[in-house]
Amino acid sequence: MSVLFTILLMAVIGGFIGAMTNYIAIRMLFRPYKAIYLFNKRLPFTPGLIPKRRDELAEHIGKVVVSHLLTEDAIRARLLDENLQKEITDTITKMFHEKMQLETTPNELLHHFGYENAEIRSMAWIEKTMEKEINHFLSTKKTTKMSDLIPTMLESELTTKLPHVTERITSKMALFVASEEGKSQIKQMLQKFFEEHGKMGSMARMFINVDSFSEKIQQEGLKLIDQEDTKNLINQLLTTEWKNFEAKELQELIPTEKQVHLAGQLTSELIQTFPHEKLFNQPIQVILRNYETTIVEKVIPFAVERMLDFVATHSAEIVERMDLAKLVETQIATFSLPEIEKLVVEISGRELKMITYLGGILGGFIGVIQGILAMWI
């Protein structure tokens, strides 16, 4: 009985010593947090291993994360993963549908981002920029001929339209001459002609019936207008004037002293025609609703794909600029020692307990062996 008791006692003592040794060793990884001094001498193993090597640990963890976990290839592969693309697309699509249920005007949206009086400030900026650009254009192009300012397509289109303009002019002239107003104008011109020529005019009026002569002039005028030579002459005059216009420099049409006034006037006219009230106060959803299907089916998937492809292509540069190793090191360095201890215990608490139990088992086993050996010695 005494032999068995001795062996059990040695086993219990050995198990206790083994378990406590491992427990203390584990605790010494974290404790004490600071060095302990006795008679101005630092006690060994103070501070604990992790507090003592904290900076080195943070640096090495950062390097390990970048070298073996968040590598460029791993990041690129993840960014090009179709599942990730689908998840991001679905998330953005869901957010888009949620926003489409609201009624948000551009004014409200800009106000949300801290941009006050958006409509007034935007229109003031547009007006200022527009006037500046018009002034700049007029100043830099003042010696440029109009033929160089007018787009080739527009010039060609206007040139081909000249015969149509001629037809329209002769048509309007014929309509006017044939009208009662035209006849009245001819009669007034004849009467004025006679009055301006004194006695000769009075004598001519004795032999000429103004009404019948007016009708005759009216008929001859219509014949003259309808003649091909007349149309050719008008067309030639228009062509000549157009060529003269093209040959002029911009400053001949708009003198330098009038440029500022013209730019301001033109800007004001353009601003008045700009529907800014409707643009800034109409819900964005109303504008987008006509394109909702296209945005969901094409725009969002395309934008997500292009964005991920861009990030993947430049992942090496992005990772380098982000300096992930330094980022991880900095984040770990911000943790307090109790937080690091808690984090490690939460992650590997079970394993640490098993190490303690293993120390107890080994200590107990060694105690049994010691008890047996003690009986033999």
From Swiss-Prot:
Record-annotated membrane-spanning stretches: 1-21, 357-377
Topological relation to the membrane, as annotated: Multi-pass membrane protein
Subcellular location: Cell membrane
Keyword field: Cell membrane, Membrane, Transmembrane, Transmembrane helix
GO cellular component: plasma membrane
InterPro entries to which the protein is assigned, alphabetical: DUF445, UCP032178
Superkingdom of source: Bacteria
Key word Repressor present: no
Signal peptide positions (record): none
Family, per entry: Belongs to the UPF0754 family.
Name under which the protein is recorded: UPF0754 membrane protein LMHCC_0318
Species, as recorded: Listeria monocytogenes serotype 4a (strain HCC23)
Phylogenetic lineage: Bacteria, Bacillati, Bacillota, Bacilli, Bacillales
